[in-house]
């Protein structure tokens, strides 16, 4: 009898899975994307009116689906306390001084940045020293700071990693966390530096100066100041041209120092000039919110555990006008991801036979400011981190015709990889490797913050082979987006978009999530993975 009843349960779950997948609608996702990317929401800025509208829309939509609140005090919200730091570029100054030579830098034209001290006036007067890529890695036996005391100094460096074309150094073209700009600032602070300046080049950053300027030239939402953590007085960037002028004061060029930074025997180079100036900033308290919903599972033992679907709701708000448009709508980044998770929440809530485990649906704030919302949830989870079975994250999906493949960045590092392969087979999808490993996408989206606390987490993305299009269609579309729309006002919704790709991606992730929700064991990181030490 038990076997018979179990067979009925399995059959019901399988039937529910098929029904749920077929009910996922690209046109519903179109409607969500269109609204979230509308000018009415003013670019969904953190702590701004448009951001609050986005939060309320997401919560109200979850409620309309019958998804229960999973935030604080019986609400759909988890408040993330932050401090908004806005640099006054007109009153701030920055110059390089060597003897009687002085090179003044212009805000946004030559340099841009912020302060992590959260003080309104921060004087800067420090010796500059070049530290290559600013990496300290025991596993890679690489230390750009070896033999150098940078306490109280400003370190100058490049983002990315040394020798990216050499597979024997770090992971070759596949960027690791040590190559990310946020790591550079963290390591500089750990070393006691007063400031950190990244010399921007498009090849090392992976995007142009306009992306840096548009992202950094406005309010910077930061986590509330922790006096126990080191804080940079200045953290920022200079253009390649301005960086070249700075380096010329000491007889160096961008090209020669990029080459020097690739040398395994690299040692830091005193640049012989001082950075002098003052950063003038205004501060305000920000109470932005993660939006969280829950659908409970059917098994009394399993419902305390949850599969977590996520996407970030924020974008850049209003900023520097480009062709008389100052609204950074963020249609692809990331109204599309929110649309996928909303549609998955709707269908999951409608299932007659719920899976064993519960499901959480999360919409993070402040991803564009350094994954702040996901970072806060990881530190203050609304359910114990050990009970989060998996995090399936969506970020920046390109609407198009269906693709023949999918990219699931990071899943191969977990015990659910075989389930990913099976779900792809059932969806008639091939699994492709990351087409742009040099971008380090695993470390650039919210799931990374959950991985850091040991939760198996990865991003589900669209593939590169679009049905009915030339083989290079996807790569050309990405190149155009990265050059002309990414973090620009041009990232807007279009009526001619085909949402078949998002529909298929949502069904794939839905199937995968259901299978994990019904699995006997909780997923784990593979033995030896960098995140296995943080959790299961």
Predicted regions and their residues:
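N-terminal capping segment at the start of a domain
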Residues: 23-49, 65, 69-71, 239, ...
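Acidic/histidine-rich catalytic neighborhood of metal-dependent amide-processing enzymes
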Residues: 173-179, 187, 203-204, 317, ...
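Acidic/His- and Gly-rich active-site-bordering loop/insert found
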Residues: 36, 239, 287-320
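Long, well-ordered, tryptophan-enriched scaffold segments
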Residues: 108, 190-203, 207, 215-216, ...
């Amino acid at each position: 009898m038990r076997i018979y009843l179990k067979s009925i349960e399995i059959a019901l779950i399988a039937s529910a899975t098929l029904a749920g997948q077929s009910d996922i609608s690209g046109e519903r996702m179109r409607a969500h994307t269109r609204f979230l990317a509308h000018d009415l929401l003013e670019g969904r800025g953190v702590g701004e009116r448009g951001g609050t509208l986005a939060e309320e829309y997401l919560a109200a939509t979850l409620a309309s689906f019958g998804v229960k609140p999973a935030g604080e005090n019986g609400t759909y919200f988890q408040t993330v306390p932050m401090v908004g730091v806005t640099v006054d570029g007109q009153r701030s100054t920055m110059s390089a001084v060597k003897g009687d030579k002085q090179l003044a830098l212009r805000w946004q034209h030559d340099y841009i940045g912020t302060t992590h001290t959260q003080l309104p006036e921060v004087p800067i007067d420090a010796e500059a020293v070049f530290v290559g890529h600013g990496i300290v890695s025991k596993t890679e036996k690489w230390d750009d700071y070896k033999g150098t005391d940078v306490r109280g100094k400003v370190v100058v460096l490049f983002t990315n990693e040394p020798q990216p074309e050499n597979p024997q150094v770090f992971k070759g073209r596949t960027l690791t966390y040590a190559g990310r700009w946020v790591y550079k600032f963290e390591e500089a602070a750990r070393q006691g530096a007063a400031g950190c300046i990244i010399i921007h080049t498009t090849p090392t950053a992976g995007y142009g100066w306009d992306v840096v300027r548009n992202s950094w030239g406005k309010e910077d939402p930061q986590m509330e100041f922790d006096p126990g953590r080191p804080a940079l007085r200045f953290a920022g960037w200079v253009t390649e041209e301005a960086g070249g002028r700075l380096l010329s004061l000491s007889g160096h060029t961008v090209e020669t120092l990029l080459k020097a930074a690739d040398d395994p025997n690299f040692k830091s180079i005193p640049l012989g000039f001082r950075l002098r100036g003052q950063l003038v900033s205004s501060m305000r308290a920000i109470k932005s919110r993660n939006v969280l919903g829950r659908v409970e599972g059917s098994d009394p033992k399993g419902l305390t555990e949850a599969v977590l679907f996520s996407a970030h709701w924020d974008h850049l708000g209003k900023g520097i006008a480009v062709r008389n448009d100052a609204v950074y709508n963020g249609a692809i980044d990331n109204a599309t991801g929110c649309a996928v998770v909303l549609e998955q929440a709707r269908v999951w809530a409608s299932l007659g036979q719920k899976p064993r485990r519960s499901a959480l649906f999360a919409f993070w704030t402040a991803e564009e400011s350094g994954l702040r919302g996901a970072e806060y949830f990881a530190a203050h989870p609304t359910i114990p981190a050990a009970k989060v079975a998996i995090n399936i994250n969506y970020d920046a999906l390109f609407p198009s015709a269906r693709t023949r493949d999918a990219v699931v960045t990071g899943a191969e590092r977990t015990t659910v990889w075989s389930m990913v392969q099976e779900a792809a087979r059932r969806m008639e999808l091939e699994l492709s490797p990351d087409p742009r490993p040099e971008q380090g996408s695993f470390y650039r989206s919210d799931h990374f913050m959950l991985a850091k606390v040991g939760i198996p987490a990865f991003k589900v993305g669209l593939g590169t082979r679009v049905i009915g299009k030339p083989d290079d269609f996807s790569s050309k579309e990405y190149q155009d987006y990265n050059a002309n729309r990414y973090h620009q006002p041009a990232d807007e919704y279009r009526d001619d978009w085909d949402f078949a790709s998002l529909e298929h991606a949502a069904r794939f992730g839905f199937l995968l999530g259901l299978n994990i929700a019904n699995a006997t064991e909780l997923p784990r990181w593979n033995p030896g993975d960098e995140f296995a030490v943080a959790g299961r």
